[in-house]
Amino acid sequence: RETTGLICQPAYALHSFWGCHFRCAYCNLGHVAHVYVNVEDWVEHIERSFSELENSPEQNLFQWDNGSDIVCWEPEYGGTKLLIDLFSRQADKYLELYVGKSDHVDFLLDYEHRGHTVCCWSLCHEAQTREVEKRTASMEGRLLAARKCQEAGYPVRIRFSPMVPTVGWEAGTRHMIQRMFAEIKPEVLTIEPLRFF
């Protein structure tokens, strides 16, 4: 918005997977996974839908999949490769791949994304990761994964999400930010408070 100086990047939400194998204390996505198994048909439907969006050329970001840390299920699921291939062929559309709290990215490094896939991490300080976000990658693991993706040419975004006021969170967050800038150069930073749906 011009009057506030804030930047808002609206995006279409793409979902083919709900559920998460992580066990973050604040999250309700765990325990049961709901999966589209006809992922090839789903990706073809997305491609056909692009023509309907020609009247909104400024709307060119598609986020997949906030309902799960989707890369945890890859490459076996197969959706990431199909979507990266699809978006790499688009002149003006971009996929935001929600890597979330994972460090599982080695399968992504050789994909031909042509700069049309953005990798987005949720980053939290180490004490929060250890105490509140069970089964997730460590802060350092996420930063290493983000660096690998950035070195493979992927644009990288970071969400400080959620900000949970654990004991020592201020010092932990300062350290996290210093480590982040020492390892990567994120193109966008987002701060999200703890929230419940």
Describe the role of every protein-language-model region:
Residues 21, 56, 182-183:
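Alpha-helix termination/capping residues and helix-transition junctions
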Residues 19, 79, 171-172:
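Short, glycine/acidic-rich beta->alpha junctions
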Residues 28, 88, 150:
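Gly/Ala-rich phosphate-binding loop of Rossmann-like dinucleotide-binding domains
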Residues 31-144, 155-159, 188-192:
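Core AdoMet radical
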Residues 10-17, 73, 132-139, 163-167:
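Short, charged/polar micro-motifs that form catalytic or ligand-binding hotspots
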Residues 142-197:
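Conserved C-terminal portion of the radical SAM core fold
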Residues 1-17, 30-39:
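N-terminal [4Fe-4S]-dependent radical SAM core
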Residues 20-27:
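Short cysteine clusters
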